[in-house]
């Protein structure tokens, strides 16, 4: 029911616009108010018609500015129906279930890892200060050493080449700035791409402000960074090349080995953000010409707040955090022992499962695409369908607000990531989607990323409701 404040405001707006309030006006306004109170977003025309009988034409006849007037008269906090997230779909769900299709964003703590975290939390082991000489401290140090060996084994590198950090972002900062600061007097030239993770981009922008020269490479029509593009950008004063292995938004696999060989010949350090590749594809930095490589725990079912940086024996970095000299004097601060232990166990499991999971996820992805083609005509898949990890599908839906679709899917228990905050074509539209030449004013993009617990039943659940959701929210 409308509260007294809202009723007073409605009467004021009616007087200002010289609108005579009828029973139909009140029916529409009361429904819209109740809908917003429940869903925190205004209803669509189809929602209003279904529950009140008022058609789109009726609403534009009854209210001076159509749906916008309905929203403003009852105090829905938007400035315009057109430049914000639009009303979400109203779907009746038969058997509700939760489906998590956002594994590129983060993953849950897998069951096999939980016991190690629980033992640490209870204080059963590993809770001493690893820098101390006590028995508890030595035990914690040994647990870290074991985890370091587990991470190293997953990359076929030496344990002492693994530096633990608080996140993948910190690892990226340490890799990029740690190399660049060695040249703080002469500066130098850095090559990266326009589609890197923000922890890389912001780092090189910062270095640019300090006087370093930075070249940003663009992707080709398939979303790839080519070896030729890197070769053309190399200069005599290039001090670092930083390129991601797998793109977080469209899942494209860059030709890292070829670029690594090129950098090795040019004697230029090669930094790779492998956050989205680690645990999905085989990574062997020493065979790929990679000098530094960042990985993150929460992308492979380990806890959040733990990452690592591989630094080849041939290279050193200037530390960003000074203090007690932990992590071979490269990253000071008492180590997060429990998370490091869990990271090591998750890395071991990922290493064992990498081939079988790749095959299973590929079959699941292909099944998803078949359902997509059959039930959602007019869509596009962003990026090459062949040269990508199967764990990721970035789909463009014509005439759809990606933010509205994301919220509509959330309401039925399906969790995904959108290409922009509220609408395709907004200022926050993805850099890489634009770089591919996609019309972001027309296509709203959604990223579906698959993981360990996803099944065909999850895909079936999504496509049971997706066509109706799209029908309700699409621009006509």
Regions found by a protein language model. Name each.
Residues 11-14, 36, 49, 60, ...:
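Residue-level preference for well-ordered alpha-helical positions
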Residues 10, 45, 56, 67, ...:
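Generic structural marker for isolated residues within well-ordered, non-membrane alpha-helices
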Residues 44-90:
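Helix-rich interaction surfaces within compact, conserved domain-sized segments
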Residues 27-30, 47, 135, 363:
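Amphipathic alpha-helical interaction segments
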Residues 1-14, 61, 89-94:
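Histone-fold modules and their flanking histone-like tails across chromatin and transcription assemblies
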Residues 21-23:
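Short helix-coil-helix linker/hinge
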């Amino acid at each position: 029911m409308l509260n007294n404040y809202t009723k007073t405001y409605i009467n004021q707006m009616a007087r200002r616009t010289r609108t005579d309030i009828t029973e139909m006006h009140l029916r529409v306004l009361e429904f819209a108010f109740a809908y917003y109170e429940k869903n925190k977003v205004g209803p669509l025309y189809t929602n209003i018609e279904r529950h009140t009988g008022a058609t789109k034409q009726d609403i534009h006849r009854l209210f001076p500015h159509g749906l916008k007037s309905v929203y403003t008269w009852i105090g829905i906090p938007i400035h315009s129906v057109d430049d914000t997230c639009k009303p979400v779909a109203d779907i009746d769900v038969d058997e509700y279930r939760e489906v998590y299709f956002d594994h590129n964003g983060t993953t849950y703590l897998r069951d096999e890892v939980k016991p190690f975290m629980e033992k640490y939390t209870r204080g059963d082991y590993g809770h001493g200060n690893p820098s101390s000489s006590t028995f508890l401290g030595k035990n914690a140090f040994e647990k870290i050493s074991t985890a370091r060996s587990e991470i190293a084994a997953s990359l076929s590198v030496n344990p002492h080449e693994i530096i633990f950090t608080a996140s993948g972002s910190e690892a990226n900062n340490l890799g990029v700035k740690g190399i660049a600061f060695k040249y703080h007097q002469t500066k130098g030239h850095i090559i990266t791409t326009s589609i890197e993770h923000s922890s890389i981009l912001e780092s090189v922008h910062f270095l640019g402000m300090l006087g370093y020269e930075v070249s940003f490479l663009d992707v080709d029509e398939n979303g790839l960074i080519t070896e030729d593009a890197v070769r053309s950008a190399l200069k005599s004063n290039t001090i670092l090349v930083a390129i991601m292995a797998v793109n977080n938004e469209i899942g494209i696999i860059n030709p890292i080995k070829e670029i690594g060989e090129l950098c090795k010949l040019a004697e230029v350090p090669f930094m790779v953000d492998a956050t989205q590749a680690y645990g999905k594809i085989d990574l062997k930095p020493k065979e790929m010409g990679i000098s530094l490589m960042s990985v993150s725990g929460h992308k492979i079912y380990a806890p959040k707040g733990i990452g690592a940086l591989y630094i080849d024996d041939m290279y050193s970095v200037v530390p960003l955090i000074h203090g007690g000299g932990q992590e071979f004097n490269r990253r000071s601060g008492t180590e997060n022992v429990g998370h490091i232990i869990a990271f090591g166990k998750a890395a071991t499991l990922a290493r064992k499962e990498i081939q079988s999971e790749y095959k299973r996820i590929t079959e699941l992805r292909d099944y998803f695409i078949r359902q997509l083609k059959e039930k959602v005509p007019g869509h596009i898949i962003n990026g090459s369908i062949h040269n990508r990890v199967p764990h990721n599908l970035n789909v463009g839906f014509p005439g759809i607000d990606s933010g509205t679709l994301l919220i509509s899917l959330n309401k039925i228990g399906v969790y995904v990531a959108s290409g922009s905050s509220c609408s395709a074509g907004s200022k926050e539209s993805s850099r890489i989607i634009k770089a591919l030449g996609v019309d972001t004013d027309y296509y709203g993009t959604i990223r579906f990323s698959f993981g360990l617990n996803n099944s065909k039943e999850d895909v079936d659940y999504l496509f049971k409701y997706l066509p109706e959701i799209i029908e309700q929210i699409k621009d006509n």
